[in-house]
């Protein structure tokens, strides 16, 4: 009964639990690859004149009555950003010793949170930063940054940390996203809709910051903000299993864990929007570097609305029943060449069957994703992969979805020319103006299993299909090359010392 109460409270059915335990039992299949996507194959790199047309298409779209939303996943704690500094606090030496520690203290006055940290040091240790460093008390400085009695950066989400310095003060990523939203996502009436997914314990802090700052950004950019929040739903938590694939129990209680960013497909599905931009909270730059980001956001949005317009026209034509063989061939070309969706079976179909197939493929949510040229190690990236219905389409895959024991697949992964910076624009209504139910377009067979421990006991955790991976598997997907300058994530605190964040 305790189990049943917990399930009821979370809104999880027993059938879901059975399904999840079966996933632990049988694992997840690897995806069959056709090729790594490249500029010749699946990634658009529009020439200057084409870019102009796409930018114009976006400007025209923004001036209609459509609803545009900027969606920013922002629930994760920033603790990973400070992993090295937490290790320094626990180390058996007092002075900065590793390269990381030295870089942090050498650049300390360059951080946007320096002034706040100075105040916290005085409050906690009675001295400012130079004073503490001068007497070799480096750990007091780090403690003031990370601990609750100080700035509490070790427990806050990235969106609320000071990232960038300006003449008039410092900005958090939340504020940088508000600025960005005004620059490329303002609708006809100058309204900017920004939606953050946050964790329950931080929601109030986000609200306070918005209440404090939204007015000044609205004034600066001549826009009106509509800022909303949601939380990951408890019903998307997944059950943990023991090594025998039985439900893991912690003191007799079933253990549930958050299902990863794939759970946010539910939050996305709840938005009332026509077009949704998605970008991670920590991928922001100061205003002086925003031009590229804004240009390429408008560009991929322009590609999206241009493709959507053509798709809708073809769907209307197929609906009318009044089309020629040549028109059906034209639509097939569009699906294969513009939407990169191929099916070896299509050549055997009569026109009427082909029309049904095309209608099914066209009438789906659509996304255009920016892709950046690989500079370092291959990571998650763009591939042409086989779907369960035998078609080949574009997918964003993580390395865990690729069979590295298969030489051909491994080579495709290693030779991949581009990676996924998480830079998407999504179209979520059909040609009749109805919202797609996004839950219907998830490929459930694309989750993955990770190994964790709880109180010293090993457990298996189930990650849902990633938001831009399997959760959007059955969308029409198009990739566009964007420059590295649009990708500036902050993985560690010292990333803030990089030129792009100064």
Task: Mark where each language-model region is.
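Long, compositionally biased intrinsically disordered regions
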Residues: 1-39, 186, 349, 353, ...
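Domain-scale recognition of functional cores that engage charged ligands
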Residues: 5-7, 11, 36-375, 384-396, ...
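Conserved catalytic alpha/beta cores of large enzymes that bind or transform nucleotide phosphates
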Residues: 127-135, 148, 153, 282, ...
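Short amphipathic beta-strand starts and helix->beta connectors
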Residues: 178-182, 406-409, 464
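C-terminal, active-site-flanking charged/polar segments
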Residues: 276, 386-421, 430, 446-451
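Polyanion-binding interface signature
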Residues: 372, 381, 407
